[in-house]
Amino acid sequence: MACPWNFLWKLKSSRYDLTEEKDINNNVGKASHLYSPEIQDDPKYCSPGKHQNGSSQSLTGTAKKVPESQSKPHKPSPTCSQHMKIKNWGNGMILQDTLHTKAKTNFTCKPKSCLGSVMNPRSMTRGPRDTPIPPDELLPQAIEFVNQYYDSFKEAKIEEYLARVETVTKEIETTGTYQLTGDELIFATKLAWRNAPRCIGRIQWSNLQVFDARSCHTAQEMFEHICRHVRYSTNNGNIRSAITVFPQRTDGKHDFRVWNAQLIRYAGYQMPDGTIQGDPANLEFTQLCIDLGWKPRYGRFDVLPLILQADGRDPELFEIPPDLVLEVPMEHPKYEWFQDLGLKWYALPAVANMLLEVGGLEFPACPFNGWYMGTEIGVRDFCDAQRYNILEEVGRRMGLETHTLASLWKDRAVTEINVAVLHSFQKQNVTIMDHHSAAESFMKHMQNEYRARGGCPADWIWLVPPISGSITPVFHQEMLNYILSPFYYYQVEAWKTHVWQDETRRPKRREIPFRVLAKATLFASLLMRKMMASRVRATILFATETGKSEALAQDLGALFSCAFNPKVLCMDQYQLSSLEEEKLLLVVTSTFGNGDCPGNGETLKKSLFVLKKLTNTFRYAVFGLGSSMYPRFCAFAHDIDIKLSQLGASQLTPVGEGDELSGQEDAFCTWAVQTFQAACAAFDVRGRHHITIPKRYTSSVTWEPYHYRLVQDSQPLDLNKALSRMHATDVFTMRLKSQKNLQSPKSSRTTLLMELSCDDSRSLAYLPGEHLGVFPCNQPALVQGILECVVDNPGPHHTVCLEVLDDSGSYWAKDKRLPPCSLSQALTYFLDITTPPTQLQLQKLARLATEQAERLRLESLSQPSEYNKWKFTNSPTFLEVLEEFPSLRVPAAFLLSQLPILKPRYYSISSSLDHTPAEVHLTVAVVTYRTRDGRGPLHHGVCSTWFSGLKPQDPVPCLVRSVNSFQLPKDPSQPCILIGPGTGIAPFRSFWQQRLHNLKHTGLQGGRMTLLFGCRHPEEDHIYKEEMQEMVQKGVLHEVHTAYSRLPGKPKAYVQDILRQQLAREVLRVLHEEPGHLYVCGNVLMAQDVACTLKQLLAAKLNLNEEQVEDYFFQLKSQKRYHEDIFGAVFPHGVKKDRAERPPGDDKL
């Protein structure tokens, strides 16, 4: 074969035939030179906006230390300008890139779409070969590399150069390939690193140590070379960059490959329950190792073995000697608990699965390493959701508000994780670089490269660190991405292309071809559609205010999807005409206020309740959610049930009732299963006795102690953070400023004015009429009594964490319902110990009774007929249950896993933030009552009793709950009537304080505000009496009317009586003649009586019938002119009312 001299550059004597030119943007010397037509610009690189006229153009190129390979004189390009301007938007500097004209491969971006963020683009990936590269393709690439190599010398070596070209040419002609010299290999590996556009640490490219392993023949030899590499590079923590190059590819059938993605990596195991132990990124490779004979250890940080392939033969497995793997345990300079996370990472990042291309030759096995940038571990390895994913756990341990993104908890947590990584590596004297320093070093490298080569290939998406963004200099730097030769390419995974010689060693798990998988998926989809179409359709409707009903409706849909074709809809999305086509209708709804439906059920309710008849007969079932403290418990659900029955629909099961105060979830599960079974029978579902339903509906009524264990934990309790996480809300601390009994000494009852203050006024925000949620503590006597009954009390001050055994019995998992705390803290702050146990809890307690009689009694009480009578007669606390059944052997784990969560108590705020900055005032009636018709034990309201025992500066954990439907009119001139007996006066105090503030500071005189108050006796419980009189004198309140129910010698008077007798004309003026507002706050019975009285007044004055007055009231509520803030007032059965100071339902719901 003749020597292809047309590939040779001109002699170096012409190398410096350049003209100097100063670029004021670059502030560096430039040189103009012409380019050969053999290397013409691809139009894709042309700078937009450059005018092309086909004339010769003088192009800039750096003159300082220009490599010889870039300084050859060439003919002018007839296509476009040879340079592209690259701007730094941080400092305004502009660089001129000419190196991109040497690019070897077209990127896969399309004319109308950018693929720059694709992880492994085709242009950067090399697949396997079946045949050698043809000599006529190989020779030009070989000569070009020889040119690059000899151009790198400062002094021209013309004779050596020509001789080398001739040698390479003859070698290719004779053998079809050629071999690099040792020096050429060193040059190629370094230059390939220099050309790597995704590497931020290239400033060290010339310091790469090269190990030549091209004489290797077996996998054992490969392993020995790799061990030498790891030992050299690790260097006791002083990491050194290195590469080991194994034999080059020949015909594609004798490849040397390292099957590992990195030399050192941690295993990832798929556990039976679907969770992943270890590094999820390595699941597939770990399974491959197991299939090839590796014995897994199922730890979080198990170093994977090496799988090495030599000369195209089947791979062999090698365990890396533990003494070669340097690992760094993670700790934090500030947080001692960080060490308890048990994290560590290996010190050596050695990429093992890339291919080195140089001069047309391919080296498919060339593991190389640098050293870590901290974010590679701290952000990607530890925090990525698809990796170890520790971000939320760290955020919780830091006490951050992980339930709200706006708290920026992710940013704060990831920063501390990176601090820990850097600290740990530096403490162990292991080389690592922070991302800011790495970004600065790359910017220096980039400037050097533009001066030396006229360009620097760079992938912006990869080079900008995963945190800090625009505060790193690389963020603001425009970059040009292209592929030069030599280059490190990605490869297809070796196990996907390897041709096995020994079929018995082939891994059992094989990937399903995409086409087969797609066909199978399509077939399964068609089958599923056919199956679902053949099933009975079921419509599930929900109406909700808080989202609870929607969640249960979705759960019900999951249950019914086992045998039906369900569709879950909100009531406001449902067309009433669809009732004529229904076969099965299920309804899950809450009851809002005084028996009303939630807002998103109003439209359907109005349409349904005026419907006279249906021609379609279908089956239905209804489940209601509510609170038994209200007299119309689950009223809307019962109303729907009655209406559907009247329309001719057939009831499938009786109405289910879920009580917010006790066992709502248990009641729903029981009703759902009964309804599902009844539906299966009614529609004759085939195989209904063998249907597998979701686990939550099949949970056992037994409590197995061996499924739970307590482990010691050193994490201190942060109460606010724990409450925030448990209740998914922002909890903040206020402190008691003062406490005052508003009732006179003559009264046997207590109503407290609680004044709470906040240190940081900026964190406190509320409007008059809104609620303050308070997280109380249980009574110490109750807590201590329960602790004395626990059979395995871990100690009052021992912090413990509950762990639950996985269903497979293979591992323990932390129960995240409660934070790590002592048992005493759990019973004090987090667990509800005053609400009577549910039926399911009684069944579980029965298994813990050692006396047969008590066990039978508990089982009997768990039945509905006995349970309700026992519950409402005794209303027992958990301690009273333990005292009633003394043979119960209750372990601590039972309490932590089975007792319900203590809920916050809500109170109407009695102050205006404008009038009393940084303060919240509450009006609290202290609750005490006796059960069993006054003969039972004395019970105390949880929150009100806790309030009464507080001292000034004691902390009060709180949250603010917005009540949009109970606020002052947006137009302050509109008249108002305020009706609030007893503590129902609470929000109205905030109203008059706000009006007083407006009057003082803006001179704004609001519209008429009439107050109607009710109490027993003017000398006992007329709370805020003087304050009301003051507001009348100042013109804030127009009138104040008071109803007294216990005046000696006079008939009892209630607010509805005053309303009827004295305010009928005012009601008509406010609600009918003017666009005014009427507010009612108090217990539900009073609110019901007030509403009835108002309807009577309006019906009489406006001559309306019953249906018209109901519609009138509906319009008032729709216009948000009739406002209610009501709470339960139903005493437990058997409570002696004249001895009760306030019902347990005083705490707002």
From Swiss-Prot:
Q: What induces it?
A: By lipopolysaccharide (LPS); in kidney, spleen, and colon. Expression is reduced in the presence of LPS in lung.
Name what cofactor the protein needs. Answer: heme b; FAD; FMN; (6R)-L-erythro-5,6,7,8-tetrahydrobiopterin
Residues annotated to bind FMN = T544, E545, T546, K548, S549, S590, T591, S627, R632, C634, E660, Q664
Record note on modification: Polyubiquitinated; mediated by SPSB1, SPSB2 and SPSB4, leading to proteasomal degradation.
Catalysed reaction equations from the record: 2 L-arginine + 3 NADPH + 4 O2 + H(+) = 2 L-citrulline + 2 nitric oxide + 3 NADP(+) + 4 H2O
- Which residues of the sequence carry a binding annotation for L-arginine? Q262, W371, Y372, E376
Q: What class of enzyme is it?
A: oxidoreductase
Q: Name one GO molecular function term.
A: NADP binding
Q: Where on this chain does Zn(2+) bind?
A: C109, C114
Q: Which GO terms describe its cellular component?
A: cytosol
Record: residues binding FAD: H771, R905, Y907, S908, T923, A925, Y929, V942, C943, S944
Cofactor binding summary note: Binds 1 FAD. Binds 1 FMN.
Extent of Polar residues compositional bias: 50-61
Q: Where is this motif: DINNN-motif?
A: 23-27
Offer one Pfam family short name for this entry: NO_synthase
Q: How is its activity regulated?
A: Regulated by calcium/calmodulin.
> Which residues are NADP(+)-binding?
R749, T928, T983, R1016, S1045, R1046, K1052, Y1054, Q1056, D1089
Instruction: Give the binding site residues for heme b.
Output: C199, Y490
Q: Looking at the record, which segments are called Disordered?
A: 22-83
Q: What CDD domains does this protein map onto?
A: NOS_oxygenase_euk
Family note: Belongs to the NOS family.
Quaternary structure note: Homodimer. Interacts with NHERF1. Interacts with GAPDH; induced by oxidatively-modified low-densitity lipoprotein (LDL(ox)). Interacts with S100A8 and S100A9 to form the iNOS-S100A8/9 transnitrosylase complex. Interacts with SPSB1, SPSB2 and SPSB4. Interacts with ELOC and CUL5 in the presence of SPSB1 or SPSB2 or SPSB4. Forms a complex with ASL, ASS1 and HSP90AA1; the complex regulates cell-autonomous L-arginine synthesis and citrulline recycling while channeling extracellular L-arginine to nitric oxide synthesis pathway.
Listed name of the protein: Nitric oxide synthase, inducible
Query: Can you name the source organism?
Result: Cavia porcellus (Guinea pig)
